[in-house]
Design a protein with these regions (language model features):
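Short proline/glycine- and acidic-rich turn/helix-capping motifs at secondary-structure junctions
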Residues: 508-518, 554-564
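Short conserved micro-motifs at the rims of enzyme active sites and ligand-binding pockets
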Residues: 489, 537-538
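Short, locally clustered residues in the helix-turn-helix/winged-helix DNA-binding domain
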Residues: 42
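Structured alpha/beta or helical-core interaction and ligand-binding surfaces enriched in interleaved
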Residues: 506, 539-542, 550-556
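Short coil/turn segments at secondary-structure boundaries
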Residues: 6-11, 51-56, 552
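Inter-lobe coupling/hinge segments of SF2-like helicase ATPases
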Residues: 19-31, 35, 39, 47-488, ...
């Protein structure tokens, strides 16, 4: 088996734990709801055959403890377990939970692995010594001796989709592996993907749901702040209502989280003399201002400019003539630091976390209430448990509703539901404030009511009426190259051979929304198949008739997760 470039490091070899001890009463801490869910899954598990189960439940409902019990059962049967996470950032806190639950350290597989440690892990996996392996998506391809259980945690997360160098969705590939090797796979989420719920409706998957929080704390109260009625001070982005509530939380020694899913200080810099917008030399995207490193940075290719003594390339004016538009996490930090000068504030984003150790320290400090205010990007939504956090404020709840992504409403609901779930996970009920310029939007309204199931029913009906995934199939063909003329010629060749098939629509070619990426020009076709045919065969037959152009790449993306 050829392994992809891997993601991981080896912790330690500890096979001293007796697998029967894992089932002793001291490990069984499930409440009645969890026990019923565990029993249902175990009946399917003991059939020793392929099955896909969705383990569903709101944040804090105890999904992890349920599948821990199944892992214990799997170990007692001398079989291996694989837990996939969408991001390695989840593993640090999670490793401790695994060690406490099972009494030994799991093997870990992620991007920091060295060749020597890679060999050790693969040896343990092949020999069967690796009882539990936690990994990012490429761990799926490891050659397990006797894999008996596969867990895909946060199965809805779009980062399971690898977008470059061999496009695949690790969640879907995990289901394929389980079906081939005949074992149980459990998909876990508080906000399942619409694809998974559709498969449940089609009787392909089994749905098991935990209805209540483990702690019995009420769900957080959600308040919508209509920003059209709010007059913000200059250079301010946080409403007075939200700031006043933060002040009350500070007085009670409770924590607040401000969420904005934009890295850096400002997403766009403009010369006020001539209107020039600073863009990447390799990509058709704006450079983002980062105060931390005094640079303008492209988030697609890493190209950067020093923001000290900048000169406009169009008119030659210097840095005192530039305006920053929009807000990122650093701009919110500046505002909150002015407003609450004595508060201990933590910035929680990939730019402000240097290593896994740094991440662990920040998570531990937040857990121990050593920070008063946390300002974070999507990284903060990833399964963390902070018992003192009782307020979440979303700076721009509408941000991801904009654009042409068919999954925009679904992704927005999932992200906001997950970040809302950080509030009130301890003994004190939580509050959530959503700053929105479109409070009448149905996605925002459903979130306020915490009516998740109603949102999913409506969203699936919209997809059915429009014949969009998951009801129908879509694929993208991206044609890219460094020479724009050659890319155009290749697209013309494809257009001349476009198949004419009933219930198959082919759109394009058209410039991709990100028309230049890492120095390559990009055009795309979109294939929309409505009747359940094998879309791969349609594309294969089409491309086989078209000669390849030297220097031009053709990339096929089945079920695209983004449309850039």
């Amino acid at each position: 088996m050829i392994l992809p470039k891997s993601e991981g490091y080896f912790i330690k070899d500890d096979d001293s734990k007796n697998s029967q001890d894992l089932l002793s009463p001291k490990y069984l801490k499930l409440n009645e709801t969890q026990s019923k869910a565990r029993a249902k899954i175990e009946r399917i598990f003991l059939q020793n055959d392929y099955s896909t189960i969705l383990l569903d439940g709101m944040p804090g409902s105890g999904k992890t403890e349920v599948y821990f019990d199944l892992i214990a059962k799997n170990i007692s049967r001398k079989k291996q377990s694989l837990i996939l996470f969408p991001e390695v950032s989840l593993t640090n806190e999670f490793i401790k939970r695994v060690e406490e639950r099972f009494g030994f350290s799991p093997d870990i597989w992620h991007s920091k692995i060295t060749p020597a440690k890679k060999r050790k892990i693969i040896e343990r996996v092949i020999s069967g010594k690796s009882q539990i392996l936690i990994g990012a998506r490429s761990a799926l391809f490891l050659p397990f001796k006797n894999l008996g259980l596969l867990i895909v945690d946060e199965e809805h997360d779009s980062s399971y989709k690898q977008e470059e160098k061999g496009i695949y969705n690790a969640r879907d590939m995990a289901v394929v592996r389980a079906s081939i090797e005949k074992f149980l796979i459990i998909l876990v989420s508080a906000t399942p993907s619409l694809e998974t719920l559709y498969n449940i409706n089609q009787k392909k998957y089994t749905h098991i749901k935990l209805e209540n929080k483990f702690s019995h704390t009420p769900e957080p109260k959600i308040k919508i702040i209509n920003m059209k009625n709010v007059k913000l001070k200059k250079n301010n982005w946080v409403s007075e209502d939200l700031k006043k509530t933060m002040e009350l939380k500070l007085a009670k020694k409770e924590q607040s989280l401000l969420f904005i899913n934009k890295r850096g200080f400002a997403p766009m810099i403009i010369c006020k003399s001539c209107g020039h917008k600073f863009t990447c030399k390799n990509c058709s995207s704006y450079l983002v201002e980062h105060l931390k490193d005094n640079k303008l940075l492209c988030h697609h290719c890493g190209y950067k400019l020093n923001s000290f003594k900048m000169k406009c390339p169009s008119c030659g004016n210097t840095d005192d003539s530039f305006i920053d538009y929009g807000a990122g996490i650093e701009k919110i930090y500046n505002e909150i630091s002015r407003e609450f000068p004595s508060a201990k504030i933590c910035l929680f984003s990939s730019d402000h976390i240097q290593s896994n150790e740094d991440l662990s320290k920040k998570v531990e400090k937040i857990y121990n209430n050593e920070f008063d205010i946390i300002i974070g990007t999507q990284l903060i939504t990833k399964g963390y448990h902070f018992p003192h956090l009782t307020l979440v404020g979303v700076i721009d709840a509408d941000m991801t509703l904009k654009g042409g992504d068919l999954r925009a409403a679904e992704k927005t609901y999932q992200m906001l539901y997950q970040v809302a779930g950080r509030s009130g996970r301890g003994d004190i009920p939580g509050d959530v404030y959503l700053q929105s310029y479109f409070p009448e939007n149905e996605t925002i309204q459903d979130l306020q009511k915490m009516d998740r199931d109603n949102f999913y029913v409506k969203e699936l009906n919209i997809r059915k009426k429009a014949n969009l995934p998951p009801v129908a199939k879509m694929a993208a063909i991206i044609v890219s190259g460094r020479n724009l003329h050659e890319v155009h010629e290749s697209c013309l060749n494809l257009s001349r051979s476009t198949p004419n098939i009933d219930n198959v629509d082919i759109y394009g070619p058209a410039p991709a929304p990100l028309s230049r990426l890492k120095g390559r020009h990009r055009q795309r076709f979109l294939i929309h198949e409505k009747k359940g045919r094998k879309i791969q065969k349609i594309i294969q037959h089409w491309l086989s008739k078209v000669p390849q152009t030297s220097g031009v790449n053709i990339t096929i993306d089945i079920d695209p997760q983004n449309f850039t």
